[in-house]
A protein has these predicted regions:
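Rossmann-like NAD(P)(H) cofactor-binding subdomain of soluble oxidoreductases
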Residues: 1-40
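Short, flexible, solvent-exposed loop/turn segments with mixed acidic/basic and small polar residues
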Residues: 41-46, 141-142
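Conserved strand-to-helix beginnings and helix N-cap segments that scaffold or border functional pockets
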Residues: 11-12, 37, 62-66, 155
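Internal alpha-helical scaffold of NAD(P)-dependent oxidoreductase catalytic cores
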Residues: 44-131
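Rossmann-like nucleotide/phosphate-binding core characteristic of flavoprotein oxidoreductases
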Residues: 180-197
Length: 197
């Protein structure tokens, strides 16, 4: 198995290098971690109550899939299966896009003339939102290019949406702005409720 954030490239490489043993390879992605990396950042309970996505393909041996599922469950994880392409599309939205937003926001503000004051007066919300901008730049550089197509589609959708907010503010479209915020709050509250079940 593996722990990569993008599955399509890993599956392609494994198919080209493992040959007849490819059937024993079970692509996996634990949805757990922090912005820290390296051995010194290891956590013994990292996978407890976190989801691990397996993306078995047509050639994947059921016995290998069962073994890897048992391994992750023994580490305390909740194991689910997804199609390779669907995994990459979902993760582009839920993981890769948020990292791009955090990196872009911090880089943008750090380039402003008032940056010292901006960071001096930044509070908890800013810290929460930008924590992942402290993630490993090289790793995220590679993730961007590994999941390029899905990430570009997601960035385009987000760009359209953020532009609608900009236009609503410019044109004083109070109801449009308030409805956007209400929909977002409702979706976030639902996410929290389901996550804490």
């Amino acid at each position: 198995t593996d722990v990569g954030s993008v599955k399509s490239g890993i599956v392609k490489a494994a198919r080209q290098t493992l040959f007849e043993k490819f059937c024993n390879f079970v692509p996996g992605h634990p949805i757990a971690g922090t912005e820290k990396n390296g051995v010194e950042a290891s956590l013994e309970d990292l996978f407890v109550n976190h989801r691990v996505i397996l993306t078995p393909v047509e050639e994947t041996c059921p016995k290998a899939c069962k073994l890897i599922t048992q391994m992750w469950k023994a580490a305390g994880a909740d194991v689910v299966n997804l199609d390779v392409q669907h995994h990459d599309e979902v993760l582009a939205a839920t993981s890769h896009l948020p990292h791009m937003l955090a990196y872009a926001l911090v880089d943008c503000l750090a380039g402003m003339q008032e940056r010292d004051e901006i960071f001096k007066y930044a509070a908890g919300g800013f810290a929460d939102f930008t924590r992942i901008a402290s993630s490993n730049p090289e790793m995220w550089h590679d993730i961007c290019f590994s999941n390029r197509q899905a990430l570009i589609r997601t960035l385009e959708i987000f760009s359209t949406h953020i532009n609608k907010i900009k236009v609503a503010i410019e044109k004083s479209e109070s109801n449009e702005l308030l409805e956007t915020f209400r929909r977002a709050k409702e979706a976030r509250d639902k996410f929290n409720k389901e996550k804490n079940r």
